[in-house]
Amino acid sequence: MEKQKTINPTFKTLFFDYDGTLFDTSEADKYALRNLGLRRFTPEWCQARKKYLAHIKASKPFEGWQEVFKFIIDNNIQAAIVSGNSRQVLNMSVKACNLYDVFPKDKINRIGGTDVKGKKMWKADGDPSLFLHALKQLNVAPEDVIAFGNHMRDAHAADRAGIRAVHCLWGVKEEEQRQLMLDDPDHECITSPQQIIDLLR
């Protein structure tokens, strides 16, 4: 049974992970894994990159997110995608699905993990750099943010940035990872995007 706690309603901003939380990128991920060994910027790599981005462009938000998007818009909540993926990918998905009502063009709300001031930032191994960068860019305090992700590393990185974290189980493919999240006593678990609304009311 998933764990749920009452979240303080004085939040100001929501951080969403991209791959496996907001968007179903499973087909793009499979393609990327098959081409991991390619040397960067070779003709083969460029062709593989082009096909990967085509898969990304075809990716859609998981079922249930439309209700969450409406809740965010209706309640004037600030939302941001904070991901280790590139900003190019995040922008492409937002544009392809026309999500500018949720992530407006004229605001900083897509924080990519690569090439931020020349440094690659990830949430791996609980590194909070990406979250700290997002807090600074959006000018919000960590206690005013809730982060939603589909991996233990997302929660650990949020913890180290002082942000409340929630596990999202719908995009978790590995059973071991899913069980780790279910057994985690320190973070809420939810099994559908619609439960985000229940947590925030």
Where are these regions (language model features)?
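Active-site neighborhood of HAD-like aspartate-dependent phosphohydrolases
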Residues: 2-47
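Glycine-rich phosphate-binding loop signature in dinucleotide/nucleotide-binding domains
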Residues: 7-9, 75-77, 138-144
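Short glycine/proline-centered loop/turn elements that form peptide/ligand docking sites
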Residues: 22, 66-67, 131, 151-154, ...
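Short, acidic loop-to-helix structural element flanking the phosphoryl-transfer center
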Residues: 53-81, 87-94, 128
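Substrate-recognition "cap/lid" segment bordering the active-site pocket of phosphatases
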Residues: 87-146, 152, 156, 160, ...
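Short acidic-hydrophobic, aromatic-tinged amphipathic segments that line or gate anion-handling sites
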Residues: 187-195
